[in-house]
Design a protein with these regions (language model features):
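Long, charged/polar, flexible scaffold/linker tracts and peripheral helical/loop segments
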Residues: 1-244
Length: 244
C-alpha cells in the first residue's frame, strides 16, 4: 500500500506528493467473505433477510413499546430497506427477492501467543443480520477475519510492560522523508502519516467491490438454493481512539 507524504511549509498538489510504500498488510475481500456466508446453508439459516419492527406489551391494557435490540430491527436499517424497495418498484421486468446485508467492522490489537510479545492489529467483520446473541458466542465463529495490519511493540523500561501501537510506520520513513524534503518528519507529521495508513488500509477493505456491492448489489444463490439480490450497507465501524 502507498500513502502520500506531504511536508509542512512545502507547497505542492496532493497528487504530486511523494508516495511511501508500506508492506505487511494482509486482507481479504469483504464481499467475497459475505458471499460465502450467504451461500453456506448453516450460516444463511441463521440470518434475517427480512427486516421488521419488534414491539412488546407488559399487559393487555398497556401501550406497546418498540424494542431496539438488533440491527435488523433498527430504524436505520428499516429506512434503508424501504428506500431500496421503493426504488425497485420503478424498475421494469422480473425481480429477485432483494434484501440488505448489514456489515459491521471492528478492529483492535490482539496477542498471538500466551508467551512472548507477538501481536497484530486485527480487522474483523460481523453480519448484522445475525442475532447479537449468536454473535456474542465465541463458539459461533461468526467473526470473520478480513485484515491483518502491521503493529509495533513498545516496552516501558520502568514497568517492563508492553503496549501495542498501531499503525506501524517502517523505520525507512525517516530516510524517505530526508531524501525528499531534507529533514526528518515532526511528531505531528508522523501522527498524520499514521492516520493516512489506517485510512489507506480501510480503503483497501471497503473500496472496489465493496462500493459496487453497495451501489449495485450482488446476485447470489443462497444457502437454501434460492437466488437472491442483496445490497451491502456498512452500518457500523467500531474503532479505538488510536485509529481516529
Amino acid at each position: 500500500m502507498k500513502i502520500k507524504v506531504p511536508c509542512t511549509g512545502f507547497k505542492q498538489c496532493e497528487e504530486d506528493a511523494p508516495e511511501f510504500a508500506v508492506d505487511g498488510i494482509l486482507y481479504r475481500d469483504a464481499v467475497e467473505v459475505i458471499t460465502n456466508e450467504l451461500m453456506d446453508p448453516d450460516s444463511f439459516g441463521n440470518l434475517h433477510t427480512k427486516l421488521f419492527e419488534e414491539w412488546w406489551k407488559l399487559g393487555e391494557s398497556d401501550d406497546p413499546v418498540c424494542v431496539y435490540s438488533e440491527v435488523y430491527t433498527s430504524d436505520a436499517m428499516l429506512e434503508v430497506e424501504r428506500s431500496i424497495q421503493e426504488a425497485l418498484r420503478t424498475t421494469a421486468g422480473p425481480q429477485l427477492e432483494t434484501f440488505v446485508v448489514a456489515a459491521q467492522l471492528y478492529s483492535d490489537s490482539t496477542h498471538l501467543a500466551s508467551l512472548g510479545s507477538a501481536s497484530l492489529w486485527l480487522v474483523y467483520l460481523y453480519i448484522g443480520n445475525l442475532s447479537r446473541y449468536v454473535r456474542a458466542k465465541p463458539t459461533s465463529f461468526s467473526a470473520r477475519h478480513i485484515a491483518y495490519l502491521p503493529t509495533v511493540r513498545c516496552r516501558f523500561i520502568s514497568t517492563q510492560h508492553y503496549l501495542t501501537v498501531f499503525p506501524q510506520l517502517p523505520d525507512t520513513i525517516n530516510e524517505f522523508y530526508m531524501e525528499h524534503y531534507g529533514t526528518t518528519p515532526s511528531a505531528d507529521m508522523l501522527a498524520h502519516l499514521k492516520w493516512e495508513l489506517i485510512h489507506g488500509a480501510l480503503r483497501l477493505i471497503v473500496g472496489g467491490m465493496f462500493a459496487d456491492a453497495q451501489n449495485n448489489g450482488r446476485i447470489t444463490k443462497c444457502g437454501d438454493d434460492v437466488w437472491r439480490h442483496w445490497l451491502l450497507r456498512l452500518i457500523l465501524h467500531s474503532a479505538d481512539y488510536k485509529e481516529k
